[in-house]
Amino acid sequence: MMAEAIANSIGRGQLEAFSAGVRPASKIDPLAVELLNHAGLSPPEHPPQHVREFSAPDSPPLDFVFTLSDTAAGEAPPMWPGHPITAHWRCTDPEQFDDDVDRRQALIRTRKELERRLRLFTNLPVRSLDRMSLQSHLEQLGRGQDA
């Protein structure tokens, strides 16, 4: 949900991001909404959907799919329409923290890291890179390295 808000803000109409999960929450986390608003970002209006919503035959083709949780990365990937380039950009799961202070700090770190990665991603010369090079750059970003 945070990545969707950040990508749609940074992309300024050139990106259309969606949130999905293998076990999506039924509602948007109020703390995440608060932190996005504080950062000047518009949170999505709807909670994340299940990944199968984006792998149905009538789903729009996707160019890129980023997994953010180890759970999602460990699942067998669906057949995405459009044969997107995929990369795992591991993020701390704020749900692993019971304490609100720790959860808040994890969400802040996650927002900052996603923003850094997505800014680097949007500055890649996507049109001039072949698929393997682009895949390599996205994997580097997932490891926390500048592409």
Predicted feature residues:
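Alpha-helix C-terminal capping/helix-to-coil transition sites in glycosyltransferase folds
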Residues: 60-61
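Conserved active-site segments centered on acidic
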Residues: 1-55
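Short, flexible, glycine/charge-rich loop motifs used to bind or transfer phosphoryl groups or to couple energy/partner
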Residues: 52-57, 75-77
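Short glycine-rich anion-binding loops that position phosphate/pyrophosphate groups of nucleotides
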Residues: 70-73
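Redox-cofactor binding/interface segments in oxidoreductases and associated redox assembly factors
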Residues: 67-68, 88
